[in-house]
Amino acid sequence: MPIYDLIIKNGIICTASDIYAAEIAVNNGKVQLIAASIDPSLGSEVIDAEGAFITPGGIDAHVHVDEPLKLLGDVVDTMEHATRSAVAGGTTTVVAFSTQDVSKKGPSALAESVKLDVDEYSEQTLYCDYGLHLILFQIEKPSVEARELLDVQLQAAYNDYGVSSVKMFMTYPGLQISDYDIMSAMYATRKNGFTTMLHAENGDMVKWMIEALEEQGLTDAYYHGVSRPSIVEGEATNRAITLATTMDTPILFVHVSSPQAAEVIKQAQTKGLKVYAETCPQYALLSDAITRCHHHGEVESYGVGIDLSSISESPFTNPDDRFIGSKYICSPPIRPEGTQKSIWKGMNNGTFTIVGSDHCSYNYYEKTSTASKHRAFDPENNKNGEFRYIPNGLPGVCTRMPLLYDYGYLRGNLTSMMKLVEIQCTNPAKVYGMYPQKGSILPGVSDADLVIWYPDDSKKEYNSKPKLITNKLMEHNCDYTPFEGIEIKNWPRYTIVKGKIVYKEGEILKENADGKYLKRGKSFMCTPKNEWVTEWRPKYES
């Protein structure tokens, strides 16, 4: 008689710290038992892993959904689309963003901003659990009183909705926040144990560079990257570390792309500072050749470890179409060839604590009443495809796990499969207050969020196993993927969320979708050192 909801047999469990052959029993959405052998008759459902890896479900803590006109366009994925795409690629938890609603005032203002999003997403079919970060871009009272009010607002957001992380921007008109306000925010995030996230680019440098390029008529998509050179990211990173050191506040840099920024981060970590960082697959795998070739009409290499000759649907099919490069515009930008090795190095040596996707999906063939191809083309408003009008962002929540499995683990750019689990599953859970419920495989404690991959060494042919990345495979609402046509050697065979199979051999099982809003705890890693550079102390430390 069955006593377990699900049994997984003949698998190789891989966690952040160990790899071993074992079998797993699941009950009531939790990992119930791990043993060398489990009687299959005890399970209502049984999966034979056939010697493949079983990993914790991936955690993508950098996902943008439902964001209208934030950065020049509409993000086309709802939370439903994003979670569907996530599970198709082995991610079982996403953390998206709730942008501060500046019309809300008073102690509950931030909690009310979160409530708007939670209420909206509760009406959608969700394929996995999700959490929310807060995007903070305006301090209600730009004065000493601001930090005290923000303290109360953060407490309310945590108590009501389990939000324990705040993101701020050092660039983008309308979102860029001053150093003064960053310090005020750090005052409050430190007190409340929030993870402080920063998009580090010097916004004033970017603004100046954009205007200087436009003055010379250099406005193709390629020049987006030229306007945001590595030094722009490096300067802002160094400045943010200085602010954080002054405030004794742990910080996490999101989507780091620059070797210069990575070096500054590693130096701070070597000094014992509480500095963490996230990078993304696009910075390890793509190079700016993908935009440069359209600008110069040349076909060059795609990036590190990716052979264009094997790509069936080459992004370089029409090198004369300079606007195709807009498919690869993100901020920070994809960097020149040769820099990607430093990103892999950072994943292996601890510079990068986590890997997120920065999923931010904009349609390439978006049309408006006055635009022939894209919102960036709007002659009535003097828009002719200039890079300043192209939305910044790439879809990527589905490809994050498989790309690092193949181009990281299988091809030797990551030191081990355990490293993949550490930076894609376990560390995100620890950094963002979800461990050990998420990001681990611990009996009686962890949610049964699991990924069963295809066997790597099997000679058996699996018709459901993809060989190339295609947009159809993504299960998102976007009309392209930047990795179209790229060879892929493995892919999730089964994605299991809280004990239910939601993705099986290429098929989404909508009837098993049961994602919920996830209230998070405080970070396991982002705790202050209680070391100060001056005699000043926050009042709450007095």
From Swiss-Prot:
* Keyword vocabulary terms for this entry: Hydrolase, Metal-binding, Zinc
Residues noted as binding substrate in the record, renumbered to the chain: Y172, S331, N392
Alphabetized CDD domains for the sequence? D-HYD
Note describing how the cofactor binds: Binds 2 Zn(2+) ions per subunit.
Instruction: Check the record and name the InterPro entries matching this protein.
Output: Amidohydro-rel (IPR006680), Hydantoinase/dihydroPyrase (IPR011778), Metal-dep_hydrolase_composite (IPR011059), Metal_Hydrolase (IPR032466), Metallo-dep_Hydrolases_sf (IPR050378)
Q: Which residues carry this modification: N6-carboxylysine?
A: K167
Give the GO molecular function terms.
dihydropyrimidinase activity; metal ion binding
The keyword Ligase belongs to this UniProt entry's keyword annotation: no
Its PTM note reads:
Carboxylation allows a single lysine to coordinate two zinc ions.
EC number in record: 3.5.2.2
Binding of Zn(2+) 2: at which residues?
A: K167, H199, H255
**Binding annotation for Zn(2+) 1:** H62, H64, K167, D358
SUPFAM superfamilies on file: Composite domain of metallo-dependent hydrolases (SSF51338), Metallo-dependent hydrolases (SSF51556)
Give the family from UniProt.
Belongs to the metallo-dependent hydrolases superfamily. Hydantoinase/dihydropyrimidinase family.
Recorded protein name is Dihydropyrimidinase
Q: Where does this protein come from, organism-wise?
A: Lachancea kluyveri (strain ATCC 58438 / CBS 3082 / BCRC 21498 / NBRC 1685 / JCM 7257 / NCYC 543 / NRRL Y-12651) (Yeast)
State the encoding gene: PYD2
